[in-house]
Amino acid sequence: MNTVKTVRELRAAVARARSEGKRIGFVPTMGNLHAGHAALVKKAGERADFVVVSIFVNPLQFGPSEDLDKYPRTLAADQERLLEAGCHLLFTPGVEEMYPDGMDGQTRIHVPGVSEGLCGASRPGHFEGVATVVSKLLNMVQPDLALFGEKDFQQLAVIRKLVRDLNLPVQIFGEPTVRAADGLALSSRNGYLDEQQRAAAPAIYRTLRQLGERIRAGAEDFPALLADARQALEQAGLRPDYLEIREPISLRPGVPGDRQLVILAAAYLGGTRLIDNLSVHLD
């Protein structure tokens, strides 16, 4: 596995791989990697011949009161994990490499519709930052395919629309959420939880599953279902940010009669905000 820091080095390495007839797979990350990231890299290796991973903690997607400064930087451990997972090329640019003219002057990309509401309401500007950095990375790497985890469901919807609307020549794959044995979705932010908070955290997925079971059983009063689920989260010691039933492509509010739904949740444990989701298929 080679590690490069500049766009010039990145493009040269990818060009060599492509000249050898290799199919390029790409997994963008912010580092502090866990088993969920490793699963994405391994899956990329199944779908492509040459796997590129980026590690870049993107300032554009953090709000002024968010955790940019304390977000863990664990490059040495990340490199070991990526080597084991089958990464061929690691791109670790600095802020100056990604935004050479500064962030204030950076052209930004807004993806309407799917960016609004949910995490978009709680984190103004977040998805603009995501769409901008993903657009830049896809243009830098120019992969045949890119993989993202379904845990960040709204982010995946934003990226799919971005790629579709801008006619970017890349296949986007969403991969299932990797979970701990107790159901908690793996996340870099789980490391912020103390022992008591970590014990309470699986209530998010448990509540989503219970809500999904009620919908599959035929319950159609979505407001009442959501009220019960919010109460369950609060009783478990969480502070809900949002809990919504949506249609999975457009992310419009789900209605009885929809055959495909996704339940999305964000909740706080102390100062740590966790997200999760559950797809519900009624066909």
UniProtKB/Swiss-Prot annotation:
InterPro entries: Cyt_trans-like, Pantoate_ligase, Pantoate_ligase_C, Rossmann-like_a/b/a_fold. It comes from the Bacteria. ATP binds at residues 30-37, 149-152, 178, 186-189. One of its GO terms (cellular component) is cytosol. (R)-pantoate binds at Q61, Q155. Beta-alanine binds at Q61. Keywords: ATP-binding, Cytoplasm, Ligase, Nucleotide-binding, Pantothenate biosynthesis. The active site is at H37. Homodimer. The reaction proceeds by a bi uni uni bi ping pong mechanism. Catalyzes the condensation of pantoate with beta-alanine in an ATP-dependent reaction via a pantoyl-adenylate intermediate. This is Pantothenate synthetase. It comes from Pseudomonas paraeruginosa (strain DSM 24068 / PA7).
